[in-house]
Amino acid sequence: LNAGLQYTGSKTPRRSTQGFELTFAVNHLSHFYLIQNLLPSINKSNNSKIIITSSEVHNPMSSGGRVGAKASLGDLLGLVYGAGFEMIDGNQFNADKAYKDSKLCNILFAKELSKRLRKKNLSIPVIAWAPGLVISRDSQGFFRYSRKYNLLGQILFAFFARDLLRIATSNEKAGMLLSDLVCSSKYNKYDFSYYSNKIISPGKFIFEKSTISKEAESEHLSNKLWELSKSLIENQIR
């Protein structure tokens, strides 16, 4: 599962057909809904894995997570209010934070899903991973939706990050990491795990098992996110 919708620079939230803030709807809630429908088939197949693409920006202590607004879901008050919320924590819309929050949701969802599968004695690895900063050379990919808000800024950022500082990776290399996660037996641990593609020097990365943020470790938060996501779907989608 992979969705990285972001509208950096936008001052107002966009909404799904059901009225959900679009970053949350696409990056988290669609994953939750899809997995509920796929689980019966996944349970019947051999050597299944569930892989969810997150980001290091879910962690306020990471290099990307420290820049701008910090990821934090509070007590999920926005979700308690129903479909009309602007931010998960109940505050006013911030496009940068909305993206980071959605990536934190990815981690919490993966962790809670793994716990619930184990309680059912289902041996299915659940992996969350962060590919790192991926910037393509075409008009797609990174910031493709937010270019209209700051085209020059996005072009300059891509040049410095990808070509000058070399802290970004390519679509092809990120795809190879995902392929390895899917195909390699070394990622068959029947538990939740998180892997990150971390930069160690310009142009050089190491893909390794990593720690999640302190907030992502919260069992209370992961369970509450699950139950509220389920409620939103039952009330607004089905």
Residue ranges with predicted function:
Residues S102, F157-K209, E219-H220:
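C-terminal helical subdomain
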Residues S146-Y149, K214, L225-W226:
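A catalytic-pocket lid/entrance helix-loop region that shapes and gates access to the active site
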Residues L228-S229, I233:
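C-terminal functional modules
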Residues P13, I206-S213:
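Short acidic, glycine/proline-rich loop/turn micro-motifs
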Residues C105-L108, K173, K224:
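Charged catalytic carboxylate motif
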Residues N91, L133, R137-N171, F205:
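Alpha-helical membrane-targeting segments
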Residues S16, L221-L225:
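Alpha-helical interaction elements in eukaryotic regulators
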Residues L1-S146, Q236-R238:
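Rossmann-fold NAD(P)H-dependent dehydrogenase/reductase core
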